[in-house]
Regions:
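Beta1/beta-strand and adjacent pyrophosphate-binding region of the FAD-binding site
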Residues: 1-13
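Active-site substrate-recognition segment that forms the wall
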Residues: 13-24, 41, 46, 51, ...
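Short beta-strand "acidic-cap" motif of Rossmann-like dinucleotide-binding folds
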Residues: 27-32
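Dinucleotide-binding Rossmann-like beta1-alpha1 core, especially the glycine-rich loop
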Residues: 45-128
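Short beta-strand to alpha-helix junction loop
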Residues: 55-68, 132-148, 253-258, 316
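Helical element adjacent to the flavin cofactor pocket in flavoenzyme catalytic cores
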Residues: 133-185, 189, 193
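C-terminal catalytic lobe of FAD-dependent flavoproteins
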Residues: 278-361
Length: 361
């Protein structure tokens, strides 16, 4: 069978690729082995355009937010499920300096309708420096979103439940051949698993481990709160606490250190006596050396593409970056130079060259 695309990986990014290809009436297959340690499995779904630590708009923040907001609202309509909804995020200040910086930003037109101050007193919180509000904030129910996409592509007979094996891919007459089917193009959305693949493992991808706690509490507020870590309400008296960031701990297990770190940080803003830890999870975020996404075409194998390296911001960035990649493929629109993987073309090595040569029949 002939297809336009093969998508590799059904995390957040691969799911978004599938949805956009479907909308554009492209014929595709998606292959996914359901890795349990990907960041998508533990992503909390919080979406906003602010770097809370520095109280700044992130790179292309408003642009990414406005596009992703429209994208997910459309998915709500199509699925008839509220997978995505608005929230207010409360930032608990840790110093008068942070408070003053935030207040200054609220008077800046760039941050109009994004930043505000909280004037409602919240019980139980230690907030002596005050609280800021991120008005432009939403949440995607990630697991439900992934399930919706998976069910949709299963119904369309577009899902291959298997681990992609790069050594079984061949290229003949400008078409990729994989397990009996042929494809015009391939988009790799592997996250940290790209490091195991000779296609794109020359890219400086850095696994960043994140750990979360699921807790029971009768005193945590019903809003999303952030104080270096976050508390996210799930159901009545159930919250997610997170997250850690470590590019040194590559152990594929939860850690006591992470649990203690999260509870210690939480204790700075609320008494943790009586908060019961119910579960702990981990995942590895795909980050890059220069902290910018990795998007573009393989330097040797034409029509082989990747979208990766968004770290914890895939939910925010992926809808627009995927659109820009498809515009590059079909309209020849240039990719943003800050995300284009050609910036790392000098890092390609003998393993990658040998693999590229082996693909050709």
């Amino acid at each position: 069978m002939n297809y336009d695309f093969l998508i590799v990986g059904q995390g957040i990014t691969g799911s978004i690729v599938a949805l956009q290809l479907k909308k554009n009436s492209k014929k595709f297959k998606l292959i996914d082995g359901q890795s349990q340690s990907t960041s998508s499995k533990v992503a909390t779904g919080i979406v906003h355009p602010i770097s809370l630590k520095r109280c700044n708009l992130t790179w292309r923040g408003r642009e990414f937010y406005e596009f992703s907001d429209s994208f997910y609202k459309e998915i709500n309509f199509e699925s008839n499920i509220e997978l995505y909804k608005p929230y207010k995020l409360l930032r608990i200040f840790t110093s008068f300096e942070e408070q003053n910086n935030w207040i200054g930003k609220t008077n800046n037109k760039i941050y109009k309708n994004i930043l505000n101050l909280n004037n409602v007193e919240l019980d139980n919180l230690k907030d002596r420096f005050g609280i800021g509000v991120v008005e432009l904030c939403s949440r995607l129910s990630v697991n439900e979103f992934l399930d919706f996409v998976r069910t949709s592509i299963l119904k369309s007979n577009c899902l291959i439940k298997d681990v992609f094996k790069a050594n079984e891919l061949k290229l003949k007459n400008n078409r990729f051949h994989y397990k009996g089917d042929t494809y015009s193009k391939i988009i790799m959305c592997e996250g940290v698993n790209a490091l195991k693949n000779p296609m794109f493992n020359y890219l400086p991808l850095i696994p960043n481990k994140g750990e979360l706690l699921k807790v029971f509490s009768t005193i945590l507020p019903s809003e999303i709160i952030n104080c270096g870590i976050f508390s996210l309400p799930e159901t009545k008296n159930i919250f997610t606490i997170g997250s850690t960031y470590s590019n040194k701990d590559l152990n594929p297990n939860i850690s006591i250190d992470a649990k203690e770190y999260l509870m210690k940080k939480l204790n700075k803003i609320i008494k943790t006596d009586g908060i019961e830890i119910m579960d702990q999870k981990f995942g590895f975020r795909p980050t890059s050396l220069d902290r910018k996404p990795l998007v573009g075409e393989h330097p040797i194998i034409k029509n082989l593409f990747t979208v990766n390296g968004m770290g914890s911001k895939a939910i925010l960035m992926a809808p627009l970056l995927v659109r820009e990649l498809l515009d590059y493929i079909y309209q020849k629109n240039p990719l943003d130079s800050l995300v284009n993987i050609n910036r790392f073309s000098k890092k390609i090595n003998d393993e990658n060259i040998d693999y590229a040569n082996s693909v050709e029949l």
